[in-house]
Amino acid sequence: MTKAIFFDVDGTLVSFKTHQISPAVRQALQALRERGIKLFLSTGRHLAMLDPVRQVFDFDGYVTLSGQYCTAQGQVLRSTPMPPEAVEELVAAARTDAFSCIFLEGEEIYINCINEMTRQFIRDLSIPMPLQRPADYARGREVYQAVTFLTRAREHLLLDRAPHLKTTRWHPNFLDVIPPSGGKDRGMDALLDYFRIPVEDAMAFGDGENDLSMLLHAGIGVAMGSAHEEMKRQVDWVTGTADEDGVVQALVHFGLI
């Protein structure tokens, strides 16, 4: 019996075209709440970047920064920054190979350099451009996640130098960088433990590589129609895209609305 549902944001709940949750999905979320199902966001975004979504619907909890910072009912349930050696590796790689990197702390968000690739990222997510700071600023600070602007052809510039980092990709132009112990599945566990819900009673929706650990961990994992084919082969169900209200399609299929 499904008692909790975790939703990725970009490309799942929110369309990359409209940057909004559709009326049909909002209606479905309200119907789920009326059934007593706990509803959570699970995203690579910082909590400060979720205001447009939170203004539309008040979720029961938040897995943010790809599982590194999780909150519910005003409490911090998981707070796992990168180890200092991982931050050093990241800073050194960004300086040596001069790639753009967004550093996400608990309170601060900053970027070392701005170019057309980073501007497109900001447009795609419809968020403000972070404050610009040199990469060295991150040294000795609590960094929970970074977004490194490296295509697949250039990702070796980071991966070859950073054994203490874990990376996931949900876009051709950038990688999410988190601690080795990180992931959305870890964040899911933090919220499920808090609400005393077994993981087999959880459902999860996502479309990117950074969602896969969560989809495989949940009792039911649903991939959006925009997900990669390899990801689709590993999950329990494949639904439509965000622009096709794929979340609603899957909820109807599983008899939840």
What are these regions, as identified by a protein language model?
Residues 93, 97-217, 226:
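Conserved acidic, metal-coordinating active-site core of Asp-based
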Residues 57-58, 66, 161-164, 217-218, ...:
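Short, structured coil segments at secondary-structure junctions
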Residues 16, 23-118:
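Active-site phosphate-binding/coordination module
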Residues 3-17:
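Asp-based phosphoryl-transfer active-site loop
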Residues 32, 43, 146, 188, ...:
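Residue-level signal for inorganic ion chemistry
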Residues 18-37, 80-86, 128-129, 182-193, ...:
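Short, acidic loop-to-helix structural element flanking the phosphoryl-transfer center
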Residues 217, 222-257:
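Asp-based, Mg2+/Mn2+-dependent phosphohydrolase catalytic module
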Residues 48-52, 157, 187, 213-214, ...:
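Phosphate- and divalent-cation-binding pockets in alpha/beta enzyme and binding domains
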